């Protein structure tokens, strides 16, 4: 059974007295009680503190960003260095919380990690560096996740973020094989289909930042078929309208612009 966030928080509060007693639990012994304690506290350190903090920072940053409508929009707008500087205070907390989670709660026995949130903590560190626009550190972190947790689905998240990092610094030769590999795994059923929406959006970003707008079109259309968020659907339609307009396909451009306007009014 999946608990709601509110219910989970209540459970967490009720468990606090017992956790205070367990707070001295060592990560050196592999027992059920120690695993339960470190998994529970790691979960809330990562998601309720670090991850939620980063999400809040990204949300505030996105609200302040301005798009340049004189150009074909990117799928993802991460802002400039000024935006990254403002976001850094949130990203730094994400890095701090995730690092604390790893240092205090990692339980490795016979080369197996028994705290299931450690890989998420590393991914959070990578995302935090990404939003700080420290792409070299982000790439190193995502590469570590891909290699270290290659038997876990989280490697697919890391592959997408690794590709995003390479795209942002213009290293398209490294981004493309990563995207192609994940696409192949999804088509073969080796990777979950839930990654396909984001994969198509990142592919579109890959082509748009190279000004290969024709290359982006099929990925934007496929992303729309997969029904991303409402805001992303509107953005994809607007980008497609811009591309059709550039190509002189005024009827299709007009149709898409009309859909965007209707959505904005609703």
Task: For every predicted segment, state its role.
Residues 3-6, 13, 21, 25-266:
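Acidic, polar-rich low-complexity tracts and alpha-helical solenoid repeat scaffolds
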């Amino acid at each position: 059974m999946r608990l709601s966030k509110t219910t989970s928080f209540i459970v967490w509060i009720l468990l606090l007295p017992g956790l205070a007693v367990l707070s001295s639990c060592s990560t050196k012994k592999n027992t059920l009680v120690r695993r339960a304690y470190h998994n529970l506290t790691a979960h809330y350190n990562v998601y309720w503190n670090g991850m939620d903090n980063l999400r809040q920072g990204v949300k505030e940053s996105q609200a302040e960003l301005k798009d340049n409508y004189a150009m074909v929009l990117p799928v993802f707008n991460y802002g400039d260095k000024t935006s990254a500087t403002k976001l850094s205070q949130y990203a730094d907390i994400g890095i701090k919380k995730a690092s604390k989670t790893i240092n205090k709660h990692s339980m490795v026995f016979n080369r197996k990690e028994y705290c299931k949130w450690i890989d998420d903590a590393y991914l959070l560190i990578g995302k935090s560096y990404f939003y700080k626009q420290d792409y070299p550190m982000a790439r190193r972190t995502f590469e570590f996740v891909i290699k270290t947790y290659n038997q876990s689905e989280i490697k697919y998240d890391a592959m997408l973020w690794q590709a995003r990092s390479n795209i942002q610094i213009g290293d398209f030769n490294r981004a493309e094989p990563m995207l192609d590999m994940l696409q192949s795994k999804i088509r073969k059923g080796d990777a979950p289909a839930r990654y396909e929406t984001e994969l198509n959006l990142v592919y579109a970003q890959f082509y748009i930042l190279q000004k290969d707008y024709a290359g982006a079109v099929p990925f934007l259309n496929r992303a729309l078929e997969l029904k991303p968020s409402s805001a992303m659907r509107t953005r994809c339609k607007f980008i497609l309208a811009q591309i059709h307009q550039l190509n002189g396909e005024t009827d299709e451009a007009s149709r898409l612009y009309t859909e965007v306007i209707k959505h904005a009014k609703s």
